[in-house]
């Protein structure tokens, strides 16, 4: 016999007498739809509500109600009872179906549900016998399957729509000697099965077969009211020695609960038993929790006549017409009861069996773990805490086991956290620290490599790398970094911890170009310092599509400018890299930036890192300054004082400057208006490094001729200065003649004897008539070292030339005065004297002139018919007159074009002559009214 623990998981809700409105002795009970239905021996049926108060009642049968069942799908009540006999040969036992939703009046003060079907149970084909059991199965509405068990071992079955009398009746034979004490329907897939219990056997009918097939499951049966069905459709039979469960294939488990079973039932997974205890002579009502092997409730009761369940309660109806309602306590109350007794395993089983939510289960396990932890049973406590993962804050558990120095248990917990994917970075750090502290390399290997080939690692990668690296487990850290694609970490360990530069270069070469570029930007400084040639080879492959390992070529290659900062302490390597790149790639989008950087490298005297050009390219100025300072601080001081080194540096500087000049020329071909470098930057670099050749080339290309001669002036290179002016001062070749004036001014202010140079300059000034003699005199007079003999011949020639011009102008003036005088005389004559027209022929047609004729003051005469409509002007003189007027209008129009005027003044050798011409033609001689 099982010795089960007893608990009070249920409690009495209320009890009392059944209302007096329920008349007669109670024969049968049923429940459903919030009501308890009672059938009495006087044929009445009564309904009780939730408060066990009388709700309604009606007379179902004239004599007695033996069985009844309240259906679930439809609000029907099926009863079996005795009615009046129609004849002595015909039994009065009837089956009735009542529709409880349809009420009809019975007299003036009562009403009853409508009886929609009446069936005589016993007929000639179905002989009368005592009814011992009754069960109704609701199939697809309106079909009912009713089984009626008899004391002769027969089962009468009725199937169909009783209300419409569309039914089929058949009988099943179990045993001719034993009564049918219990029935139970079960659906097994699509097959309908019927359990039938007698005192001597347990049987099963397959209702799908025709006729139904009988199978005997056991040769020991049960008595009336000791048969029930579980919620899993298992048949339960109670016998004095035990309770047996049956499946479709035979007897299942049994429970040795001794005592004669009076009533059996099933409620929410609990087995309900009313047992006569022979030892004490009491009748006991027990509620069994079979899954958790405990008695959930036990109470001594008086004689029970019926047992049913409704409203979430268990209802016991006693023989004295009193009842007892028993209800289940809430989960919290039950758990508190178990916690007080330290029955944590029972509590866990309880919440799991009743399908409580996972959080509630985890809470119970936490309390159990706390209990075990308090008893210092750390291993078992940790097992419970592991089951709370996902619901209990991990820090609660971790803190406990950190304090207790239980590193093995803590390691186990952290491993489970990672398995479930709930570990944070801190958890990963702690677990790896546990492994390293325990020096458990095997577990560390398992943790690191268990995901090998499966997919993403289920822990924080960077945290794992940091911890392994700090504990000198470099191989593990590198494995994680490589598996997770953390190339920067992999290289960091190789370079900073292991100093394995060859493997680092090999690893970078194996990466995709985009990834390799990123890693080179981060760790290129170290690689350049130790493996410059190999690193430059990798950079060349990245930037020029040469030999990419996996054969994948990028549509957008990285620019060499992106990698310049990795050479911050190695300008020689940078120069070598950019030269190699420029040889291969001629049309790079970053060609200007590359040339700028190369120019700074070529032109700097000490070959420093190109900070100016990089700032122009938009790189971080603070980073550049810091890197340059670091590079300077690392410079070898002996190299600055060693004479041989100085000679070598001077030679190197000369060679680089020559390269710089070649680059200046090559990157500014004649067909380009702007060069492939920053001109302003190039000028600054040449100025800073005193690179005269480059500066002269740039100024000349930019047509800054005055700056060109300024360079010669600064160096007092008189020969080169004059040669430069000869080349750049010829206006016929696009030069600037004013350079000679600047040159003359220079010699006038130099304070040295430069007679030879001045004479040569005066030759070109005189040839191109660049300056007036007075300006030449004033300019050269400032040099005290020059004598008048320098300009004697020049002045004589200019005076002679000016004298000739003055004489020519005097004669022209006299001529114009004579012409003007004659014109004024003619005008006066026209005003004061008459004109005699003596022409005898028409000027137009040359025929004899006759009247009407037209005479003009110009002494031309015409037939009037030859003039036509034009009688106001002479056809012979009009073209010349119009030409003069058109010229006048053009001059007036030109007077408004100021740009043209200044352009002519600027382009002329003698600007004053242009102004005089404008005045002479009367273009700008008229003063306009400012208000007009």
Swiss-Prot record:
Extent of the CHCR repeats: 385-536, 548-756
InterPro entries: ARM-type_fold, Clathrin_H-chain/VPS_repeat, TPR-like_helical_dom_sf, VPS11, VPS11_C, WD40/YVTN_repeat-like_dom_sf, WD40_repeat_dom_sf, Znf_RING
A GO cellular component entry from the record: CORVET complex
GO biological process, one term: intracellular protein transport
Coiled-coil positions: 795-841
CDD domains: RING-H2_Vps11
Zn finger (RING-type) start-end: 842-877
Superkingdom, taxonomy of origin: Eukaryota
Keyword annotations from UniProtKB, A to Z: Coiled coil, Membrane, Metal-binding, Repeat, Vacuole, Zinc, Zinc-finger
GO molecular function: zinc ion binding
Membrane topology: Peripheral membrane protein
Tissue: Expressed in roots, leaves, stems, siliques and flowers.
Membrane listed as a keyword: yes
Compartmental location: Vacuole membrane; Prevacuolar compartment membrane
Primary location recorded for the protein, binned into one broad class: membrane
Sequence similarity: Belongs to the VPS11 family.
Functional description taken from the UniProt entry: Involved in regulating membrane fusion at the tonoplast and the prevacuolar compartment.
Quaternary context: Core component of at least two putative endosomal tethering complexes, the homotypic fusion and vacuole protein sorting (HOPS) complex and the class C core vacuole/endosome tethering (CORVET) complex. Their common core is composed of the class C Vps proteins VPS11, VCL1, VPS18 and VPS33, which in HOPS further associates with VPS39 and VPS41 and in CORVET with VPS3. Interacts directly with VPS39 and VPS3.
Protein name per its UniProtKB record: Vacuolar protein-sorting-associated protein 11 homolog
High-level lineage: Eukaryota, Viridiplantae, Streptophyta, Embryophyta, Tracheophyta
